[in-house]
Amino acid sequence: MQERHGLPLRSFSSGKALTAGRAVRPEVAQERRYLQGAPLGLELPGRIALRDPHCAWQWFEPEAAAEAFPAAHWLAAFLVLLGRYGNEEITLGFPEPITVRGRQAPALLRSSYRAMESSAERSARLAEELDDARRQLSADGQERAALAGRCAVQVLAARPTASSPGWLALVLAADGSVGLALRDPQYDELRRIAGHLARLARGLVDAQACVGRLPWLDADEERRLQALRSEPQAAPSRGVLHHLFEAQARRTPQRIAVHAADRSLSYAELERESAALAVRLRAAGVAPEQRVGVCLRRDSGLLVGLLGVLRAGGCYVPLDPAYPEERVAYMLDDADCLLVLVDASTRERVAALGRPCLTLEEGGDQANDLALPASEVGADHLAYIIYTSGSTGRPKGVAIEHGSAHAFLRWAGQHYAAEEWSGVLAATSVCFDLSVYELFGTLAEGGTLHLVENLFSLPDYPRRDEISLLNTVPSVCAALLALGDLPGGVRTLNLAGEPLRGHLVRQIRGQPQVRRLVNLYGPTEDTTYSTVHELDLHAEALDEPPIGRPLPGTTVEVLDGFEAPLPLGVAGELYLGGIGLARGYFGKPEQTAERFRVDPGSGERRYRTGDRVRMREDGVLEHLGRLDDQVKFNGFRIELGEIASCLASFPGVSEACAMLTEDSAGLRRLVGYLAAPFAPPLQALNEHLGQSLPHYMLPSAFVVLAELPKTLNGKIDRKALPRPQATGAEPQALPSDPLEQALHQAWQAQLGAPPRAGQGFYAAGGDSLRAVHLLATLRQRLSRRVPLQAFAGGPATPEALLELLRQAAPEGDEPEPSAGAAGLSLAERRLWVAQQLAPEDTSYNLLAHLRIVGATADAIEQALRQLLERHVALRRRVETGVDGPQPHALAAHAVPLQRLLASDAVHAERLLEDGVRREGARVFDLAHEAPARLLLVVTRDSARADLLLSVHHYAFDDVSLAVFAAELKTLLDGGRLGVLASTPEQVAARERAALASGRLDRVAERWAERLLPLAKAPGAAPARPEESGGRAGQRLALPVSAAVHAACRALAERTSVSPFSAALQAFAEVLGAELGVDDLLVGVALAGRSRLEMQGLVGCFVNLLPLAVGLRPEQSVEWRLRQVGHDLLELLEHQDVPLECVTQALRQRGASGLPIRIACGAHNGRAAPAVDAGVRVEADFIPVPGARLDLTLWLEDQPQGWLAVWTGVSAIFDLHRIERLHQAWERRLLANAGEPISKRMSPEGCNAS
């Protein structure tokens, strides 16, 4: 596994790289087989940074060298040392002849580490490995040195020189002397490694000793580890959880305790109502250790309910009302709940399970008159049971005692100041332990809770600016930042529940209101948080920020597979102990004993986390991943084994597993793999899973195989499992009919799943863009053209599309492009002309930022040169001649590529900011220079690099960035790029041929007749400001609420149009009401890439085509929407018709032109290829000031829904007006869908004014 502080691990996939250039002999193929997959890297203690191959060697002779062990003994000890450092497989290079066991060692030796074998077995296996390598490798002399020199670890015959290869070397001299050398400036580190080696060499003398248990730490190391396992501060006191709230209520009775959707409650009111409920619960039999289910909606009653159960002496078991009935029933049975606390919204559902219920709203008046007697509950009684995903297929309840929760809250009160508690957002489900911090931590410290449904309710939350502290998972925080929804009052950010990445820290640094960023780690089994790390927002952000040091009263240890301590810097499993440990898993003694271990030395309990960590010299822990099948997905802890167990229980499935995958577009999703003789029906499979698993554990894709691939030891080989994109969500045998087969494959390519009988394209997750690509694929493969109108007026089922394919006659050949220079396409010419009219205008400069992690600067520069050579659009200047503007390609090296070295991340950011400022103000001289400039900023001693791409719009567009980023990643990962299917010149030539044929003019004339009334009506668009400088722009990115997004999709499905059509219709209606017009001219932004061969091109192909939207109130919503859907599909089908053709046709009819001042567009997310097994490349455009049109709305598809990006000319649409338009647009969408409109979105507010 590649780690940040080690030499990046590499391996040869074929062995050809090692044997390349050698004469082809019969033995070469044999050598390649031996070398296939051989790892050439090295894992060493984390504080050693093996980065500089020119660093001087440090030299040390181990103490045991005086004992004159033979070379084979030292070699075995060295291999054991590397194995215990985490190198399960290692390749040693022998660049010089060395004698081992009386024979010359081979040039390379592949070896593996087996912790359970004895010293004698290790010695015998080493002899076998040496013999095997000698048989399969024949290199000698220069060939030997070339082969061995590729390895990070060397075995030398003499002390290394400056030119010696490798990073770590064991020296076995002919006179029997032994030494270690390391390319690292830290002499003490080498001394420590040598000490480990010496002690292991002595231990190997015992032939029966287990190599994984050989002692290797000295007394100083053991004392140091003991000192770092806990903090010196005294542990917080154990007590009763709700006593903290009761004491606070007595101190500040009138202070507001919670703002919720239904009402606000003071501390006195919350105390009184929870006490009344506690009286009722005690009367129902609740006492210490009695479990009470809590199934309540998320309003003020939730807090009353939780506190009521605690104050009655009971233990609350939270139940999410959205959980499947089977899961709720299992949790109630497993916890043996006495009763369930419900409200009016959940009563019927719980009662249907046959459980005794107590309704929150009933009986409160009588209980208010009764005093709450003192409870017998103590620190050792249960406070709550939270169910987590279980590897056995069933969730398991983590039982937390009052004393553990009390101690945790005491720490929280000391760690955070009073002003930080003044406004805490409570957005986490009570079924997850982060809620314990949010709810009870705030109430213990006299703060005010802001209780919302979830974090994505923030945009509509009226008190959002009162929130001072946010406690959430990194993925949700990243989404909030992307949406621009981080409240302005937030001063403290707690991030927990998932690994925190450096790129998110850098984004948070750009939020001026955030003054404190805290990275917290901890499993539910250790009461929410176990370690804490404060991040310096003014210092360089590491790519993997650490999880910090333990909380007071908590112990941390990094242990190996034998539960023995590991040296500082060596990766192992994290064990937790101390005051926060849970009692165990409720009712599951065997699982409790498996995870909650007893230290044989001290007798203390400690919890096996399953997390792989290492401890730095200062005691700070770094999180490296998981050791088991547990994953964190969107903040939820998920045991993949539970999903696999549920999959395997489906009839016909013999074996199953689940994985969290990440595709090339950066989308993370759960995928289920099934071994079955046939593909089970997708709907039936989803229904089966939905009966047991909560929504966040449901796979979004499935792969069905005849059998799951296995490793040599019989385990499922997860690396060999195919990606879901390749196999699909519900694999089926392809139809035998060629037309049906082509439709099946094209549908699956666009939607990631094969077609299902009767399911419409939009209902299956499609949109207009995917529809275009689907038909383009079919047209290319079958030479049959199905009109896009097939997606209007009906659900566009597979059956309907197949029938249209059968009816479509094969197309004839397209008009051949004429000979001669094609010149510029009309889209390119349009932007070139704009540059000529305003040579100093920089509004068409596009700036993109690409962040690259895991590649060297030389490799990045080489890949960039390849891309510049590949994509001629980035290096074409434009000359003006008798035939008009003509492009002329420059050499790739003529495109400026500047490389700067930054001393640290702060310096890098400053260089980038300077670059953005400089490039944003610098014009392109398209007549004499390439339309692109590149700035590569490399950070010293870091795996990161930043690329600033400055390019004129004439040569680039949105899709181009996605292509550029994806191809850059492919090259940096060592892949090859296929031959481009077209060029910008060929696109322009085809356009010229189509114009000559008259086809484009005929379409344009038809549109012109329809648009003529609007083209002559100047009032159909906002009036432009008279003053100059009206191009100054405002940009506002606002999330579309989940309710609106769902309503829009439902409306689109009901009317058989795309969701974008529904959004566009509402956009036009809101603007029409704003402007007082019955019809509106809207420009629709289109990619202009209707042909498949254009998909992989870098260039400018965008088109802006006019759409007339009727807004007459006498027409029904559905009629208007179907009309927009029909017209939009016509635009998409003919998106190659240039805007100039439409404008010319209008002028021929007496119109002065086409006043497009308002536009709307959509695309499927940003270009952000994510890390899979290689280099990570993240790309995005940098927003530039200014607005080219009066108002534009872009809808960006994101995992959580839509992001609406509004841009307007400042003098017409200020930020306040844009925000009102957005709210009115959402209201209109809900109204059109016939959905209930909330009080905040009343029908009276549909007009934005």
From Swiss-Prot:
The UniProt comment on domains reads: Modular protein that contains an adenylation domain which activates the alanine residue into an aminoacyl-AMP ester, a peptidyl carrier protein domain which bears a phosphopantetheinyl arm to attach the activated alanine and a condensation domain involved in the condensation of this amino acid with a second amino acid bound at the carrier protein domain of another module.
Q: Which reaction does it catalyse?
A: holo-[peptidyl-carrier protein] + L-alanine + ATP = L-alanyl-[peptidyl-carrier protein] + AMP + diphosphate
Q: Which gene encodes it?
A: ambB
Any idea which UniProt keywords this protein has? Ligase, Phosphopantetheine, Phosphoprotein
Listed cofactors: pantetheine 4'-phosphate
Q: What is expression of this protein induced or repressed by?
A: Expression is regulated by the PhoR-PhoB two-component system.
Q: Which GO terms describe its molecular function?
A: 2,3-dihydroxybenzoate-serine ligase activity; phosphopantetheine binding
Q: Give the protein's biological function.
A: Involved in the biosynthesis of the antimetabolite L-2-amino-4-methoxy-trans-3-butenoic acid (AMB), a non-proteinogenic amino acid which is toxic for prokaryotes and eukaryotes. Adenylates L-alanine and loads it onto its peptidyl carrier domain via a thioester linkage to the phosphopanthetheine moiety. In addition, loads activated L-Ala in trans onto the second carrier domain of AmbE. Can also activate L-Ser, Gly and D-Ala, albeit to a lower extent.
- Entry EC number(s): 6.2.1.67
Q: What is this protein called?
A: AMB antimetabolite synthetase AmbB
Q: InterPro entries, per this entry?
A: AA_adenyl_dom (IPR010071), ACP-like_sf (IPR036736), AMP-bd_C (IPR025110), AMP-bd_C_sf (IPR045851), AMP-binding_CS (IPR020845), AMP-dep_synth/lig_dom (IPR000873), CAT-like_dom_sf (IPR023213), Condensatn (IPR001242)
Stretches for region Adenylation: 245-633
Uppermost EC category: ligase
Region Condensation: list its residue ranges: 823-1150
| Gene knockout outcome | Mutation abolishes AMB production. Deletion of the gene almost abolishes the production of the quorum sensing signals 2-heptyl-3-hydroxy-4(1H)-quinolone (PQS) and N-butanoylhomoserine lactone (C4HSL), but it has no effect on the biosynthesis of the quorum sensing signal N-3-oxododecanoylhomoserine lactone (3OC12HSL). Deletion causes a substantial reduction in the production of the virulence factors pyocyanine and elastase, and it reduces bacterial virulence by about 32-40%.
Q: Which organism is it from?
A: Pseudomonas aeruginosa (strain ATCC 15692 / DSM 22644 / CIP 104116 / JCM 14847 / LMG 12228 / 1C / PRS 101 / PAO1)
Lineage top rank: taxon: Bacteria
List of residues that carry O-(pantetheine 4'-phosphoryl)serine: 768
Choose one Gene Ontology CC annotation of this protein and give it: cytoplasm
Protein family: Belongs to the NRP synthetase family.
The UniProt record lists the Carrier domain at 734-809
Task: Region Disordered: list its residue ranges.
Answer: 716-735
- Which GO terms of type biological process are on file? amino acid activation for nonribosomal peptide biosynthetic process; enterobactin biosynthetic process
